[in-house]
Amino acid sequence: NYSLSSATLDINEKPLSLSGTKVYDALATAASSALTISGTVGGQDLTLSGNGTLSTGADVGANKTINTTGLSLGDGVSGTPGTASNYSLVGGTHQMSVTQKPVTISGSRFYDSTTNVSSSDINTFNNIVGGQTLAITGSGSVSTAVAGSGKTISLGTLTLTDGTGLASNYSLSSGTFDINSRQVNITGSRIYD
């Protein structure tokens, strides 16, 4: 009683997902250059431009959700180029992990015949971002007690603590230490001759 004369078919955009990792930089930014696109058909290549934002802020964390406003898909330019209009970032899973930023420390004291490095001897924190400050507790050591510069610190119990920045966003990777020569005063006397 019926015959099929025609039909229509809608082809919807395919949702894509984004993933990436960056080292803590005090910014809640998910830069396109740090993100990888997944979910294209047949491994088609697409480009990504702009910046997204991390919904839970800049701090270190795994699989933080990316707000994709500010990110744009573009046609592929290498491999098997894809057409951006066939795809969408709506409906995909978009996550970025933020890892701790390595920090190095340095300090100095005068010779005291020990190899101890106290937290109070540490005066420089290198590689901290955004004008932040950190503090430190605990103690470490150097290999020899003699005076010298650029000695490698065995970190021991040295631990970063919060300053204006959060210590949890950083990792203590290494340090150098100077032991300065101690001034010695000599006195004496003799009988007039």
Question: Where on the chain are the PLM-derived regions?
Answer:
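Short loop/turn motifs that initiate or flank beta-strands
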Residues: N1-Y192
